[in-house]
């Protein structure tokens, strides 16, 4: 799912959801970046584009099973961990990122 799947006039949901995916799940309630750092992961992030949302990380081989478990957990058990506070916080972050992009040369073209 990407931004092309959003109704006209109601954009930003895919990007907001991408951000929420890093805020913990029902079984792993801490910030997802914390778990990745503890595993020795590098190059971790998420991106949202017109036709997709990506999540990626590079983990040491001994941490692969744990990383795959965390991925499956956040894909299946995110909803119960989303609080109004997390939603409000990430909404502000995404709005800020959009403003920064709009202020770049060509930012409003996309």
Regions found by a protein language model. Name each.
Residues 3-107:
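Active-site-adjacent, His/Asp/Glu-enriched structural segments that form or flank metal-binding
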